[in-house]
């Protein structure tokens, strides 16, 4: 079949490079690097490797702000996943990844392959994946298309995760109109590793073979990385060919085979990397560049599942379930035999060279020959113009929103029926969260907890981000996202260790959007420094706009913490009647960006809630100490819907009630002030708990009751609600909306 690719002249004169994602200045830079005009394959290589998705060319200046080091960090940013030390020679590898654009176009496969990709990132480090989490954003559930997106995305996550046998143990979902045509699907994978097994994605050692393992290469996902680096349009729905198709059963075999190699053949394994965004070109050029080496690849040897594939297609394909290995000379047959045992193909497709060039050969001809660092390291970096949006100052000066609270119980019920607050049981029951039998705290509490086999330890994990706060004030909102994630870990009995961040923003070419990115990074960095949770991995997803309409700034924070002793595991639900209820933290009239403001005004505006990081850290440390000393029966972070929602949620599981007198007016029941915790304590531990908290803003509110009634009093005012009625509304909202 004749190759009808455009000539170098046509690429230049017809500006075909623009269609591939390169700007005029970038194309000129490529010509300057090569000392000639690139051919079609070379133009394709640069277009994907210099896309935002692969090069972070627009976000690098911002990413440099993040603190990435700490005594607990075994592997920081730059590899497949970050790793933290949990003692006993063990580490936890974790990372979050987005699959936003593909999930709008083809929600089932988009979500499924997002799960598959992040799992490969984690096991490529040498870690066994032990848990999945997700962070999802959708528009309001008031159209058939919105309901379809939710159902298909959840089915895709469940279909892949359940089939591969990794429990999906936690996550979060927010519903807002800005996500109607820009849904966000962020998947996080957590793995366990022996520190001695940590791998690098590198190809070094002159003459060492590079091996392709896993599924054959097809034409799916070509230019997927570029697709993820441009603004969306309605026509974008036609870009289904840029969405990959996943096979979880193939991935399960690949996972076991790769861990087998890492565990038992580490002496002959030089490096290993997932073929993710930008496929073979990305993994191979990055592995060579990191090692300061070159690479020669023979395209004829790449396993192909379609006829007449060109080098361009093979290099850029994002077919799933593929890995690239660099092994020591003389051990190819050993590796092939191992993969054969799993029914997988392992093929030599090239070798490491010493010239730092990336040479591609097809049918005996050199079809691409470019400096490897130019592809993998030297993409141009842009510091985009930044401008404060006019809305920001207007929000700062706006008169504070005062909610209508004539019918407190009526508002309470309405809030519990909002899908962002309502029970997500209908969603998470589609996930297998008990497979592997190590899940100690299942979805529905503040953080998920997975036991570490052979120890008394457990790993706490969560994903968090309230993007409404970031829309009001990205710096404060970014800090709150980290603080809330840490609160959830602490409430569960864990010490926060580190974060992975999924930075989802609109079009960075717009100065107002780049300002949001910069400010959010400032807030995240400040919180990470104060709470000692360095950023050890992450992902950037920009251009989340459709037809000019963008999302709220949504930097998803995935956090992992260590529960030192299984006895410290704590959940949000009240345990026994008679237990004493405490509130840690101060409640103010803060409704801007709240679920209540959205409910009553149909929009959000005003000043974001205040956050004092020093106070936040102090309260977290005190609460964790109380939990570790065995003084706490239950613990719950106050988030969306404030005290009223947290109190109701704490009663639901055991069908208990509560009788409390609060130190704030009842119209502040649903304020979303930060740095607050709802805690219950056994009567015999009350004195010790109160003594520990002695000098702080900690309030004894009342007791857990046997009946299913919640009574809340402030001075002369009192409201009463039935737990069973509130729970019925809370549990029924999402199934009803999805009908």
UniProtKB/Swiss-Prot annotation:
Keywords: ATP-binding, Cytoplasm, Ligase, Magnesium, Metal-binding, Nucleotide-binding, Purine biosynthesis. Its EC number is 6.3.5.3. Mg(2+) 1 binds at residues 97, 539. Substrate binds at residues 98-101, 120, 244, 318-320, 541. It catalyses: N(2)-formyl-N(1)-(5-phospho-beta-D-ribosyl)glycinamide + L-glutamine + ATP + H2O = 2-formamido-N(1)-(5-O-phospho-beta-D-ribosyl)acetamidine + L-glutamate + ADP + phosphate + H(+). ATP binds at residues 56, 95, 501, 538. InterPro entries: PRibForGlyAmidine_synth_PurL, PurL_linker, PurM-like_C_dom, PurM-like_C_sf, PurM-like_N, PurM-like_N_sf. It comes from the Bacteria. It is an enzyme of class 6 (ligase). Pathway: Purine metabolism; IMP biosynthesis via de novo pathway; 5-amino-1-(5-phospho-D-ribosyl)imidazole from N(2)-formyl-N(1)-(5-phospho-D-ribosyl)glycinamide: step 1/2. GO terms for molecular function: ATP binding; magnesium ion binding; phosphoribosylformylglycinamidine synthase activity. It is found in: Cytoplasm. Mg(2+) 2 binds at residues 121, 274. One of its GO terms (cellular component) is cytoplasm. Its main location: cytoplasm. Pfam families: AIRS, AIRS_C, FGAR-AT_linker. GO terms for biological process: 'de novo' IMP biosynthetic process; purine nucleotide biosynthetic process. PANTHER family: PHOSPHORIBOSYLFORMYLGLYCINAMIDINE SYNTHASE SUBUNIT PURL. HAMAP family: PurL_2 (MF_00420). Part of the phosphoribosylformylglycinamidine synthase complex involved in the purines biosynthetic pathway. Catalyzes the ATP-dependent conversion of formylglycinamide ribonucleotide (FGAR) and glutamine to yield formylglycinamidine ribonucleotide (FGAM) and glutamate. The FGAM synthase complex is composed of three subunits. PurQ produces an ammonia molecule by converting glutamine to glutamate. PurL transfers the ammonia molecule to FGAR to form FGAM in an ATP-dependent manner. NCBIfam families: FGAM_synth_II, PRK01213.1. This is Phosphoribosylformylglycinamidine synthase subunit PurL. It comes from Listeria monocytogenes serovar 1/2a (strain ATCC BAA-679 / EGD-e). The gene is purL.
């Amino acid at each position: 079949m004749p190759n009808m690719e455009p000539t170098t002249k046509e690429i230049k004169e017809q500006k075909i490079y623009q269609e591939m994602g390169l700007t005029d200045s970038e194309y000129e830079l490529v010509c300057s690097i090569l000392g000639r005009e690139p051919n079609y394959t070379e133009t394709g290589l640069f277009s994907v490797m210099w896309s935002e998705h692969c090069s972070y060319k627009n976000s690098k200046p911002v990413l440099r702000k993040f603190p990435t080091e700490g005594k607990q960090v075994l592997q920081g940013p730059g590899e497949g996943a970050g790793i933290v030390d949990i003692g006993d020679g063990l580490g936890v590898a974790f990372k979050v990844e987005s699959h936003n654009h593909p999930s709008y176009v083809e929600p089932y496969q988009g979500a499924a392959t997002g799960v598959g990709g992040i799992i490969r990132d984690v096991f490529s480090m040498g870690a066994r994946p032990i848990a999945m989490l997700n962070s999802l954003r959708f528009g309001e559930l008031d159209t058939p298309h919105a309901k379809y997106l939710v159902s298909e995305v959840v089915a895709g996550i469940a279909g892949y995760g359940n089939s591969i046998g990794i429990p999906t143990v936690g996550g979060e979902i927010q519903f807002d109109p800005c996500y109607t045509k820009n849904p966000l699907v962020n998947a996080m994978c957590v793995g366990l590793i022996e520190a001695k097994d940590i791998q690098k994605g590198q190809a070094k050692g002159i003459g060492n073979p590079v091996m392709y393992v896993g599924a054959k290469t097809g034409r799916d996902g070509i230019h997927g990385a570029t697709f993820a680096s441009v603004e969306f349009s309605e026509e974008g729905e036609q870009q289904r060919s840029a969405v990959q198709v996943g096979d979880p059963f193939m991935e399960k075999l690949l996972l076991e085979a790769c861990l087998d190699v890492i565990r038992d053949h580490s002496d002959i394994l030089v490096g290993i990397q997932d073929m993710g965004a930008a496929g073979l070109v990305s993994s191979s050029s990055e592995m060579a560049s990191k090692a300061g080496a070159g690479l020669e690849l023979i395209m004829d040897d790449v396993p192909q599942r379609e006829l007449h594939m060109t080098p361009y297609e093979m290099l850029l394909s994002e077919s799933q379930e593929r890995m690239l290995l660099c092994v020591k000379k003389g051990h190819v047959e050993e590796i092939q035999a191992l993969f054969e045992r799993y029914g997988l193909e392992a093929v030599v497709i090239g070798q490491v060279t010493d010239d730092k060039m990336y040479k591609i050969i097809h049918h005996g001809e050199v079809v691409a020959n470019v400096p490897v660092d130019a592809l993998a390291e030297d993409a141009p970096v842009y510091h985009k113009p930044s401008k404060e949006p006019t809305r920001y100052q207007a929000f700062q000066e706006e008169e504070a929103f005062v909610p209508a609270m004539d019918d407190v119980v009526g508002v309470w019920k309405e809030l519990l029926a909002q899908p962002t607050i309502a029970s997500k049981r209908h969603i998470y029951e589609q996930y297998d969260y008990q497979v592997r039998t190590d899940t100690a705290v299942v979805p529905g509490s503040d953080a998920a907890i997975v036991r570490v086999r052979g120890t008394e330890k457990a790993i706490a994990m969560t994903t968090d981000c309230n993007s409404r706060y970031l829309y009001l004030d990205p710096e404060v909102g970014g800090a709150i996202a980290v603080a809330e994630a840490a609160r959830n870990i602490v409430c569960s009995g864990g010490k926060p260790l580190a974060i992975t961040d999924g930075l989802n923003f609109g079009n960075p070419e717009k100065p107002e959007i780049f300002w949001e990115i910069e400010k959010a990074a400032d807030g995240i960095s400040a919180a990470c420094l104060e709470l000692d949770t360095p950023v050890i991995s992450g992902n950037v997803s920009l251009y989340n706009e459709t037809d000019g309409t963008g999302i709220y700034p949504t930097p998803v924070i995935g956090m992992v913490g260590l529960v030192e002793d299984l006895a410290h595991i704590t959940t949000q639900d009240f345990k026994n009647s008679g237990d004493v209820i405490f509130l840690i933290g101060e409640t103010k009239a803060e409704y801007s960006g709240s679920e209540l403001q959205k409910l009553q005004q149909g929009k959000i505006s005003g000043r974001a809630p205040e956050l004092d990081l020093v106070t936040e850290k102090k309260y977290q440390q005190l609460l964790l100490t109380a939990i570790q000393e065995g003084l706490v029966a239950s613990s719950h972070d106050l988030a969306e819907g404030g005290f009223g929602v947290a109190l109701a949620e704490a009663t639901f599981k055991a069908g208990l009630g509560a009788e409390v007198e609060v130190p704030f007016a009842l119209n502040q029941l649903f304020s979303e002030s930060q740095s607050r915790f709802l805690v219950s304590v056994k009567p015999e531990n009350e004195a010790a708990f109160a003594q520990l908290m002695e000098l702080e803003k900690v309030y004894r509110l009342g007791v857990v009751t046997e009946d299913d009634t919640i009574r809340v009093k402030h001075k002369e005012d009192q409201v009463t609600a039935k737990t069973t009625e509130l729970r019925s509304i809370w549990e029924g909202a999402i199934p009803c909306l999805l009908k």
